[in-house]
Amino acid sequence: MYSYQTNFIKKGSTKMNNMPKVKIGIVAVSRDCFPESLSVNRRKALVAAYAAKYGMDDIYECPVCIVESEIHMLQAVEDLKKAGCNALCVYLGNFGPEIAETLLVKHFDGPAMLCAAAEESQNDLMDGRGDAYCGVLNASYNLKLRNLKAYIPEYPVGTAEECADMIKEFVPIARAIVALHNLKIISFGPRPLNFLACNAPIKQLYNLGVEIEENSELDLFEAFNKHEGDERIPAIVAEMEAELGAGNKRPEVLAKLAQYELTLLDWVEAHKGSREYVAIAGKCWPAFQTQFKFVPCYVNSRLTAKGIPVSCEVDIYGALSEFIGTVVSEDIVTLLDINNSVPADMYKEAIEGKFPYTHKDTFMGFHCGNTASTKLAFCEMKYQKIMARNLPIECTNGTLEGDIAPGKITFFRLQSTADAQIRAYIAEGEVLDVRTKSFGAIGVFAIPEMGRFYRHVLVERNYPHHGAVAFGHFGKALFEVFKYLGVEEVKFNQPKGMLYPTENPFA
């Protein structure tokens, strides 16, 4: 059973409990015809540079320098294991032993990166020249021979300070890889009728190392009913009241929402099994409202704020994308419909001349009410307006509605598409400081060249209408995560003059 504590995320806080802590072991390697001291001293300088700029929380300095020896390699692996490292940096202080250094990547259980030392001075190019620039080529060749993966930065050869920056950029990438290999997605119910866009071939989940547990929404309903009268409900209701403040416009539904939140949290604890981390793909219509007597949007937002993403409409790859965004950004994410165009009069009144975007660069991102309160400029508990057109309003209470706070965003998705291949897209942009004058959790988004991206990536490559949103620019890290996972097609919003394969050059 979930032991409840008052720990909802407040503004400015990023305490989240559903992701790993990364510890990168730095291992220096040396070719036997080069001075071992060259690699060792450069490793020490690298660690000192990292500590000075970022502290030592993310790294561990392995005392073993691998010199053309598989025995050294095994010693390094054992040392890293004892130190609790779950990620690896192979540091070429000189040319490096191409066999032993790549065997290190093979035998280490976790994501790996490779970087190398630049030469320090023109005054020390006799005994002080390391040739790591050359060694990276042989290392990459040997990695390919063994079908091994390693993150190699855009320019992997640098000074101690530059290599420290490379390792820091590897931290969120490594965190995502470690997390995915320990992730279980829990889903409830089949996708809603007439919702083929949320079709989710699960083969690619297994290829990524992700487990999935698929449940009936009847199982969920049974578990929910068993939580009626749970003694923990009042504490959660009090927390909800504190979070909502003046926006608590539907107080009568809070106890039911608290009951549902406990149901999900207890299910996670009871069903995560061998996995450490969980994401949820939840059902929210059409029968949900008539049976549960509310909509789950607000609870979805609260769990997502705790680091447990909950996607809408049983969107399994949406939940996966949200989870990746959470661990990369170490922040709350959301899942939105790429929903509607911005009216021409709104564009002319509030955007044109004030922001550097054309009308086609803009759109509205929307969902019924699943975005965390800390990511909204203002919020109120309301009812699901679209569902209430056909149902009693009291069955549709539970949305958290308001305009999404302005700021930088990354819109992205990892998806097993209609042909069961794995693909992804990433586009950086922003939420504009423009009132939406609409309902739901909603914002006016702007992405450079969105019109072309919409047509030649989202439409042409058959992506569903849901996209994950990270609050900041995280495209660089996400791109490397998808590369590391073996995703061969990662699309982005191409600038003017860079035509998509399907784009008409005469248009």
Predicted feature descriptions by range:
Residues 17, 21-24, 57, 116, ...:
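Cap/lid and interdomain-hinge subdomains that line or gate substrate/regulatory clefts
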Residues 72-85, 102-104, 263-273:
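Short, well-structured alpha-helical segments in soluble
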Residues 304-436:
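C-terminal catalytic subdomain
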Residues 16-52:
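N-terminal basic/disordered segments at the start of proteins
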Residues 85-94, 113-115, 277-282:
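Periplasmic-binding protein-like
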Residues 385-507:
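Extended hydrophobic packing segments that form well-structured cores
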Residues 1-15:
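Short, Lys/Arg-enriched N-terminal segments with co-localized hydrophobic residues
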